[in-house]
Structures are given as structure tokens and as C-alpha cells.
Amino acid sequence: MSTAVLDAPKAATDHPERQYLTLLADILENGVQRGDRTGTGTLGVFGRQIRFDLAKGFPVLTTKKLHLRSIIIELLWFLKGDTNIAYLKDNGVRIWDEWADENGDLGPVYGKQWRSWATPDGRVIDQISALVENLKANPNSRRHIVTAWNPADVDDMALPPCHCLFQFFVADGKLSCQLYQRSADVFLGVPFNIASYALLTLMVAKVVGLEPGEFVHTFGDAHLYLNHLDQAREQLTREPFDFPTMKIADKRDLFGFEYEDFTLEGYQAHPHIKAEVSV
């Protein structure tokens, strides 16, 4: 069966989700097979990019149904600076269970680095709070960057950060975000990452008084696990629906958002496609 979807230029002007479908097809057609840490094996490409205009709908995939609650709860967990899965489990989210130790701890993962990066002189840097303040005080700065990749802590993390650095950009009253993802599980992980960082952009824009611009997703190692190839081919047979609209509460405290503050309107999607997580 052919896996071709659309060439990249047409994909960009047709339905924005076709960029993701084109990435699936690209990996199936051009990916290099390699062994990996999990023992499953991957088919991968290197250096790809997709982008979404957040004024034209919320980029949650429609060619397979996603569990939006997990995406929202995980993002709120990151923003809390939490690194224990208790909050996730209390809210019915199990996506980190496989990596936690017997006490539910994950080591100094995303939340720790985002909210309390430890410096050599004993200080702690809250990157997210600093980001918000700097966006308000100096929107034209080129330093609106948050990184989760801390070489001093990587060996102590249950899973080193896959989506490891993001940058915000302000122009014409709009806030855009670019994410660099060093390792991208394109079938299972990337759909979550797209929605998560798009949502973060909407939240930060609301807090700092800007309109949402673009979410740009840049990939390093973009791969399909070898046990996801049939699922990817199945997804490629599906036509996307219009993107839904995300409504969020009018809050000015980024850390004051709760799950009930988000409403996704008009989400129509094809059925979920089951695939196993490689740990």
C-alpha cells in the first residue's frame, strides 16, 4: 500500500494535520532502521519541522482520537514543578507509570528543570516565572527560552527530556512558540507534544496579554518504533476533520490554571489506534 500523503508545499496549504501525516509517510518511505535503547528498534529520519497557526484551530490530531485529559493534566503537572506521579495518578493519568520508581519518583525531570533549576552556587532558577516576567517587560528579547536539558542531572532522570528546549517570539501582538525535540516518538508521543505546547502557548499568551501566533515543532531524531508501522499506515488512510477550538479561562496567573479551565469545542476524530509504549 502506498504511504504517500501530500507533498510538503501542498500539505502546508491544505489541512495543517497533513504535515503530521506527511511526516509519518516520510519516515515509512525514507527512514533508516536502527536499534535503540528500548530494544524495539526504530525507523527514523533527522531534522524535520511542522508548524501550526493557532488562530486557525487547536492542533489536536483528528485522524486518531487523543485523550486530551492526559495532555492537560501532564502540562499542569509540569508547571507545578512536580516530579512524582502521585498527582497524575490522582487525576487518572498513567502515562508516566512505567518510568517511576517504587515511590513514584522520576528524578529531576521536566518540572524540576522548568521551575527549580539548580545552579552551581546553590541558587534555584524558576525558568517559567522568569519567562513570563520577561515576556511582559521585554517582549522583543531573543532570550525567551526554557530548557529541560540539564547535563548535570541527565543521569539521575528516569527518562531524559525528549522535548528539551522551547523559545517564545513576540511580533505584531502575537506570541509564537518553537519547540526543539531531540527524540520524537512520532506515532505515540508527538501528537501529545503538539497539543501540549500549543496549549502552553495559549496559556502564556493569555497571561501576558497577547494573541496566539504559531506553534513551530522542530525535530531531531523523528522515528517510528518498528511495532508502530502498521498503525501508522492505518492512520495514513484517514482524512482529517477540521481542528476544534480550545477555550481557556481568562486568568493572569499561569500557575493558577486548573483542568476545569479548559474546554475543547467541536472535536471530531477518527477512532483511537492502539500501540504499545516502548520503555
Curated annotation (Swiss-Prot):
Main EC class the enzyme belongs to: transferase
EC numbers on record: 2.1.1.45
Gene3D superfamilies in UniProt: Thymidylate synthase/dCMP hydroxymethylase domain (3.30.572.10)
GO cellular component term of the entry, any: cytosol
Residues annotated as binding dUMP: 37, 142-143, 182-185, 193, 223-225
Catalytic activity: dUMP + (6R)-5,10-methylene-5,6,7,8-tetrahydrofolate = 7,8-dihydrofolate + dTMP
PROSITE patterns cross-referenced by the UniProt entry: THYMIDYLATE_SYNTHASE
Segments crossing the lipid bilayer: none
GO molecular function, one term: thymidylate synthase activity
Short name of any one Pfam family annotated for the protein: Thymidylat_synt
Pathway listed: Pyrimidine metabolism; dTTP biosynthesis
Top-level taxonomic group: Bacteria
GO biological process: dTMP biosynthetic process; dTTP biosynthetic process; methylation
Function, as annotated: Catalyzes the reductive methylation of 2'-deoxyuridine-5'-monophosphate (dUMP) to 2'-deoxythymidine-5'-monophosphate (dTMP) while utilizing 5,10-methylenetetrahydrofolate (mTHF) as the methyl donor and reductant in the reaction, yielding dihydrofolate (DHF) as a by-product. This enzymatic reaction provides an intracellular de novo source of dTMP, an essential precursor for DNA biosynthesis.
Subunit-level organization: Homodimer.
This protein's name: Thymidylate synthase
Natural source organism: Caulobacter vibrioides (strain ATCC 19089 / CIP 103742 / CB 15) (Caulobacter crescentus)
Recorded name of the encoding gene: thyA
